Design a protein with these regions (language model features):
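Amphipathic, small/basic residue-rich leader segments at the start of a protein or domain
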Residues: 1-109, 130, 134, 362, ...
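Glycine-rich phosphate/cofactor-binding loops in nucleotide/flavin-utilizing enzymes
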Residues: 11, 92-93, 114, 254-269, ...
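N-terminal glycine-rich flavin-associated loop
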Residues: 107-126, 152
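C-terminal helix-coil-helix/basic helical segment that borders enzyme active sites and/or dimer interfaces
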Residues: 30, 295-298, 309-364
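Glycine-rich beta->alpha junctions and the first turn(s) of the following alpha-helix
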Residues: 5, 215-312, 380
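A short core secondary-structure module
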Residues: 167, 172-218
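A structural signal for short hydrophobic beta-strand segments in well-ordered beta-sheet cores
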Residues: 160-163
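A short, Trp-centered hydrophobic/proline-enriched beta-strand micro-motif
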Residues: 138-146, 188
Length: 407
């Protein structure tokens, strides 16, 4: 389609909105200075359960204002509430948002980054018309009801049952490692609807009301002491057939579409509060607690820096290559592998330089603060599918290698 306004015109519009809505970041405050401010670090921006209410109000308020200003779904189709512009327009505005002090928007990532794009691709026009505007406006919080105690990376082994009852389905089963379930309004749920069919062909996907009778959400406490995940019990939860996504027994394709977005980590929500921050912070650790003249330390720093730059360049290239409504292909999974490689190189450097400071709080700024990051890193290797599963998928679907022998 032909864009109706230029990127510069959109940015001028976006800048006016942001100036009137949120404060701009102070360049001096953003500049990293060792020992100044909080030394807190997280792998990802997190939602504190104790402050969930105020976080939700702030995130939903900003998302609603952004959407009402025509900036909430810039590359979405007009018929579903989008602006109808290009992916380049959307990326340009997301980068502009990064210059402002936005509220914590991580609670919206599943809706805007994973489920919203998937629904646009595979859901019925009725579902798209009804739900997509609400998702991109921040009116609805989403979660993914995929993993189960006996079906993690192998989602085709899902055992949660959905039994037809007239115009409704009764869903019974257990899901685990569900982010945002405690705050969600809807969950996209994969269920087994034909136990006699091959496991990939007997699945159907539904949108479940997380406030419905029979839904029980319980927090899971991680080794960091936080509870960013949940287990969800479904006991004969009634779901109308109108909330089915895709055809009956064709749910595995829906799963792949959602995971294509998750594993590529291409989301319109600007990331603030997660990650290691500027490379200067990593150098500061080596300078304060190690020896910058040591050749091994310098080699480790070079490896970490190279991985950071490679990730940035790969992410920029892949995001720019996506067209509106296009589902990321399996090659996007290389991002997940690259992220884990970077984290491992960083954790190795931190262990060598900080030693016991990683597990014993000595009160030194910038030392024990890394403990949360290090403890959270193993989960990033598993989230969105274990690395072994991801490598198999890349080998088979990108490189054309033969499938693994199966029993």
């Amino acid at each position: 389609m032909t864009d109706t306004i230029s990127i510069d015109e959109l940015l001028a519009e976006g800048r006016a909105f942001l100036d009137a809505t949120v404060p701009a970041l102070n360049a001096a405050d953003e500049e990293f200075v060792w020992g100044r401010g909080s030394d807190q670090l997280n792998v990802l921006e997190e939602v504190d359960r104790d402050h969930l209410g105020e976080i939700l109000v702030a995130a939903k308020g900003y998302a609603a204002a952004r959407y009402d200003a025509g900036l909430g779904w810039i590359d979405g189709p007009v018929e579903y509430g989008g602006r109808g512009l290009s992916t380049e327009h959307a990326i340009a505005f997301a980068e502009l948002e990064g210059l402002y002090e936005l509220p914590n928007l991580s609670i919206l990532v599943i809706a805007l980054g994973f489920v919203g794009p998937a629904l646009r691709s595979v859901a019925s026009p009725e579902i798209c018309s009804e739900l997509l505007p609400k998702l991109y406006r921040g009116d609805l919080i989403m979660c993914q009801l995929f993993s189960e105690p006996d079906a993690g990376s192998d989602l085709a082994a899902a055992a949660t049952r959905a039994v037809r009852d007239g115009d409704e389905w009764l869903i019974t089963g257990q899901k685990v490692w569900t982010s945002s379930a405690h705050a969600a309004d809807l969950g996209i749920c994969v269920c087994r609807t034909d136990p006699d069919a091959p496991k990939h062909r007997g699945l159907t996907t539904f949108l479940v009301d997380m406030h419905a009778e029979g839904v029980d959400v319980r927090p899971l406490v991680q080794m960091t002491g936080e509870a960013n995940f949940n287990e969800v019990f479904l006991n004969e939860v009634r779901v109308p057939d109108s909330m089915r996504v895709g055809d009956v027994n064709s749910g595995f394709g829906v799963i792949l579409t959602v995971l294509g977005n998750e594993r590529s980590i291409t989301t319109r929500a600007p990331k603030r509060g997660g990650g290691v921050g500027p490379f200067e912070r990593v150098v500061g650790v080596a300078r304060e607690f190690g020896d910058l003249s040591d050749p091994i330390t310098r080699q480790r720093l070079a490896e970490v820096y190279s991985s950071m730059r490679i990730r940035e360049l790969m992410n920029a290239r892949w995001r720019a290559s996506l067209q509106p409504g296009e589902t990321p292909g399996p090659e996007m999974m290389l991002q997940k592998i690259g992220n884990h490689a970077f984290n491992q190189e960083l954790v190795t450097l931190l262990g060598e330089v900080l030693g016991p400071r990683l597990i014993a709080d000595t009160g030194e700024w910038g030392a024990y603060a890394w403990a949360n990051y290090v403890l959270s890193t193993p989960g990033m290797r598993i989230g969105g599918g274990t690395e072994e599963i991801v490598r198999n998928t890349i080998g088979e679907r990108v490189l054309g290698l033969p499938r693994e022998p199966r029993a």
